[in-house]
UniProtKB/Swiss-Prot annotation:
Any one GO BP annotation for this protein: maturation of SSU-rRNA from tricistronic rRNA transcript (SSU-rRNA, 5.8S rRNA, LSU-rRNA)
Superkingdom of origin: Eukaryota
rRNA processing keyword on record: yes
Biased composition (Low complexity): 103-120
Protein name stated in the entry: rRNA biogenesis protein RRP36
PANTHER family per UniProt: RIBOSOMAL RNA PROCESSING PROTEIN 36 HOMOLOG
Length: 338
């Protein structure tokens, strides 16, 4: 009885794992190894030849199939050996390399260094775009601990200056109220709301400032007396006229302040009377602006003589007539004067 060997398909022969045999490393150059080693086309051809041999073995005897199997096994072993030689190649000697290979290596190193430089530049630009604000890494740095809990905290003075200038925006520093001289700005911080017609904060501030700086009236009176004395002594006409204008300005400011004080006194007196009436159960009565002016005029004329009252009325009549003439057109102004 003849022993029949089992045939294996050629595809399984190519995929079968074969243990590589140990061979000493060749002492030739890399170029010789590449030239001696079979290319991928050769491997493909050998595989195709193995397939053709497998087809022929079906018609031929069993001895032919054994030879094909041995050829396929040897080709797979050679392929594995070549892969190992490619992975674990011998160390390259720089003296044996050509100038072209060295130039390519230098170009590759330059390109890698330029890429790293570009990455660092991009990181710097991102930091600059942050307008100098500290990042998470910089804020994470902790300062040294204090030697004592009562010791002052040490802060670094090397803080980056922001590129953003917010002088046009409203910040906390611009909103912070600044100290002002009440002689020149008596209305205080609520002047804007009072000018718009809503809010009595400005009047309250003005009353407080007036009471707190009432002693300035004595200083102004003494200054006016000194000005009158210097006007009498000066002989230069230009200097004398300049001093007279200054004295007239101070007198007009004093008259305006006295008028405001009288108006405020009239309103305060009316409020006191109304508070007493409200306590008795009556409804409060609020004065209109026109009624306030009438009461102020009555109070002003009460302390004057008849001649002074006539002068004040004549002055007021001329003032009102001048305002009315300004409102008329030029043609009618001439007719009115005639």
């Amino acid at each position: 009885m003849s022993s029949v060997k089992r045939k294996m398909p050629p595809s399984s022969l190519l995929q079968r794992r074969v243990k590589p045999r140990y061979e000493p490393e060749p002492e030739s150059d890399i170029e010789e190894d590449v030239s001696e080693g079979p290319s991928e086309d050769d491997v493909g051809l050998s595989g195709s030849e193995g397939e053709e041999g497998g087809e022929l073995s079906e018609d031929e005897s069993g001895s032919g199939s054994d030879e094909d199997n041995s050829d396929a096994a040897s080709s797979s072993e050679e392929e594995d050996d070549e892969e190992e030689q490619e992975d674990d190649g011998p160390p390259i000697d720089a003296s044996q390399l050509s100038f072209g290979a060295l130039a390519k290596a230098q170009a590759a190193m330059r390109s890698s260094s330029s890429k790293s430089q570009k990455a660092s530049d991009a990181a710097k630009t991102k930091e600059d775009e942050g307008y100098g604000h500290p990042t998470k890494l910089s804020s994470a740095k902790k300062l040294d601990k204090r030697s004592n809990k009562h010791a002052p905290v040490e802060l670094t003075s090397k803080k980056p200056v922001s590129r953003k200038r917010d002088f046009l925006t409203s910040t906390a520093e611009t909103k912070r109220p600044q100290a002002r001289d009440p002689r020149f700005t008596p209305l205080g911080p609520g002047a804007s709301t009072a000018a718009a017609g809503g809010g009595s904060g400005s009047t309250i501030d003005e009353i407080k400032a007036r009471k707190a700086y009432a002693f300035l009236d004595d200083y102004r009176a003494s200054e006016m007396q000194e000005l009158r004395a210097t006007i009498k002594k000066t002989k230069d006409a230009a200097q004398r006229e300049k001093l007279q204008r200054a004295l007239l300005s101070m007198e007009s400011r004093k008259k305006a302040q006295d008028r405001k004080d009288r108006e405020r006194a009239v309103i305060e007196e009316h409020r006191k009377k109304e508070k007493e009436l409200v306590k008795q159960g009556k409804t409060p009565f609020y004065l209109k602006k026109s009624e306030q002016k009438k009461r102020v005029l009555v109070d002003q004329f009460q302390g004057m003589k008849k001649r002074q009252v006539d002068k004040a009325i004549e002055r007021r009549r001329k003032k009102v007539a001048g305002k009315e003439k300004k409102m008329l057109p030029m043609t009618r102004r001439g007719a009115e004067e005639r």
